[in-house]
């Protein structure tokens, strides 16, 4: 039977400033840590990415034409404040006013993120969010944006606090490239959650119009053998690192006893301690019921085994299937040999994990209010067919269809899910894979910056029109 989605459902497309805009040093934009990190370590940079800085009218016209009625956009903090604080860059401000006006002209609702992996370099060098001064600067920047852009009705503080701590201090594939430092991982998570809570409280106290929330990446963690206590414990600990610690801070305003026991165990094995103040708990508590929505980014699930050894992670950046290794001291190891399809980058395709994660939020955090699936999609080595000027991306259509089906199931089972944003609207630059890995509804020829709708774009258009998942 064909499943349907609600009449008022948002069928969106997602982007991010650094991955889409290009123009990394145009019109007074300040540097971000990624600029230097890519120059020093990789064979690609985010210049010109998808040239969204100049081509946004084209992408928004395509959005309107293909039934995309919501877009995730992030403001580049360093376009507004090149150093993260102090002097405002008027050209950056003007750009976002023009961009939001174009969104409204095309009837595409902008869902605007304040921070999407791109702390200004000046602040990043000084410890990023491990330095509590960055919290203050972020809140000042947030307040400036709330005042300056009343045309925005949906705000998100951060995109993926979990993967920021994970990428910067655990896997080491984000600048500053530190590995296996659990103290920094949890402190980064916590400090960013304090910054989130302060910004949300300020938004509500200031009486700004619209809604505010946060976007969390929530990969579901399962024990490889549910009857093996070591595997069960490994899944619980891995879930605390990636999901529970951050969800507790968001909706409980504190960390549950089980969460803190898990954190203390991980830190006792690996070294380090957390610095959490009474004021931190007070602000987390003050904000816990003020989030209007939760954005869930979901791509994959993981299966965990018990593990008694040192930490070792090998990140698959090449798309050669089978190149991943992930084992953490005192936590567990990911088992890749499971009967689940996976992408060329070893991401486990498991739609049931999205259903389970949504229902977990509904059950454990009943004050969640509503959910948007803010990212979900398939990274693929798309083959452009020159004669047809398109891509036959049936695998992407199938991936999205499967995930929308479980979203429909979750709604039927009582979850308040209000929209879905495919990652990504058009092909964009990928943080650790450059330009090889494509996700978009619209194919971007990065040489000419021309856009070509893929087969998935036509499928998505029909979906948005009929609300039927075919």
Swiss-Prot record:
Record InterPro entries: 6P-beta-galactosidase (IPR005928), Glyco_hydro_1 (IPR001360), Glyco_hydro_1_AS (IPR018120), Glyco_hydro_1_N_CS (IPR033132), Glycoside_hydrolase_SF (IPR017853)
One Pfam family matching this protein: Glyco_hydro_1
Listed EC numbers: 3.2.1.85
First-tier enzyme category under EC: hydrolase
Keywords annotated in UniProt: Glycosidase, Hydrolase
Gene3D superfamilies: Glycosidases (3.20.20.80)
Coiled-coil blocks: none
Catalytic activity: a 6-phospho-beta-D-galactoside + H2O = D-galactose 6-phosphate + an alcohol
Residue numbers binding D-galactose 6-phosphate: 19, 116, 159-160, 297, 430-431, 437, 439
Family designation: Belongs to the glycosyl hydrolase 1 family.
Protein name per UniProt: 6-phospho-beta-galactosidase
